[in-house]
Swiss-Prot record:
Keywords: Cytoplasm, DNA-binding, Endonuclease, Hydrolase, Nuclease. Transmembrane segments: none annotated. Belongs to the NucS endonuclease family. GO terms for cellular component: cytoplasm. GO terms for molecular function: DNA binding; single-stranded DNA endodeoxyribonuclease activity. The gene is nucS. Pfam families: NucS_C (PF01939), NucS_N (PF21003). Cleaves both 3' and 5' ssDNA extremities of branched DNA structures. It comes from the Bacteria. Its EC number is 3.1.-.-. Signal peptide: none annotated. This is Endonuclease NucS.
Length: 223
């Protein structure tokens, strides 16, 4: 991973245009090919980013370097670097990934075993289906053979919806899978998370862990 702290302007050129005026920012260039631009707020969310695969070309506009990040669709992030305060590269190695807590891992196993709880005619394609940013819990097919990505949480919060949204964005770029729908499944889903999921066309499924362990009933609340 390459970390750069620089005074820079950033322009996105693609389906839309967006401009970030000159400011000190953190630029992350990851080994997977992704590039993201961060400020000292917004928590983990970047100001702008380019998902992999993409390539970086360093050009010059007079004496000012311009780093052009371009994806396969021809969209570009044009980073005009006015001054560099820090530039370092670090080898992080292969990450073992997020280890789910016991309840989430068991929920995933139970739902994979009884995938029909997602709906009549559903079939499991794979557990822990890998994407460039991590594994989605379940990849399934619905009764019409369409792809469905399922993210499972013990407590359904906005972060989980954002995580599934990023998975869906990447999965829908795969012509062998697209279109890919999303299901956000949890024991309890907070109202704000449900509202965000609904707005993004993601279906919410409330799971009863005790019933799933005993499988005494097929009745689940589906919203």
């Amino acid at each position: 991973m390459r970390l750069v702290i620089a005074q820079c302007t950033v322009d996105y050129v693609g389906r839309l245009t967006a401009h970030l005026p000159s400011a000190r920012r953190l630029l992350l260039f990851k080994a997977d090919g992704s590039v993201s631009v961060h400020a000292d707020d917004r928590a983990y969310k970047p100001l702008n980013w380019m998902s992999p695969p993409c390539r970086l070309v360093e050009q010059a506009d007079g004496e000012t370097p311009v780093w052009v990040v371009e994806n396969k669709a021809g969209e570009q992030l044009r980073i005009t670097v006015e001054a560099i305060e820090h530039d370092s590269s670090h080898e992080l190695g292969v990450d073992p990934g997020l280890v789910k807590d016991g309840v989430e891992a068991h929920l995933q196993a139970l739902l994979a075993e009884h995938v029909e709880l997602l709906g009549a005619g559903y079939t499991l394609v794979r557990r822990e289906y890998m994407t460039p940013i991590g594994p989605v819990d379940l990849l399934c097919r619905d009764e019409q053979g369409r792809s469905v990505a399922v993210e499972i949480k013990r407590r359904g919060e906005i972060d989980g919806v954002e995580q599934l949204t990023r998975y869906l964005e990447l999965l829908n770029r795969d012509s062998l899978l697209a279109p890919v729908a999303g299901v956000f499944a949890a024991q309890q889903i907070k109202p704000q998370a449900r509202t965000l999921a609904t707005d993004r066309g993601i279906r919410c499924l409330t799971l009863d862990y005790d019933k799933m362990r005993g499988m005494d009933s097929d009745e689940f609340r589906l919203f």
